[in-house]
Amino acid sequence: MAERTGSKAKVDTVAGESRVEAAEAAALVVREDEDPWTEEELTEVRELLMSDVERLRDEINDAEADIADLLRSGDTGGEDQADTGTKTFEREHEMSLAANHRDMLVQTERALGRIENGTYGVCESCGKPIGKARLQAFPRATLCMTCKQRQERR
């Protein structure tokens, strides 16, 4: 089951960046066989997520610029069907990449929000701890391994 230590702490915000207090880290749920989150561990996860947000926003902007270029080059009358098919494939590929980046951005921002509101590490399906090791490997995780495996079997 879950073990919650400490009490929920306030988060000071300076220039858009949250400062993690030790009590906030200790208040996050962990599995019984895990040590509580330390301030350093939570800061590391938060910084990774914030850098992912910046990277994903840049990648989305780049993909949207590529899509706009592909749409502008569009359908010119002198192209054969192979060229048109290639451009259509490239455009759809860029649109798919942009959509994937947007989904990852939403997941990343959601993980940051869960850290802020103290629900980071709680499985959204069963309410049990996700597991600190899983979150350190995949910080955007919202499901414990059991629930994730169940979801993938469906």
Language-model features, listed with the residues they occupy:
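Short flexible coil/turn linkers enriched for glycine and charged/polar residues
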Residues: N117-T119, P129, F138
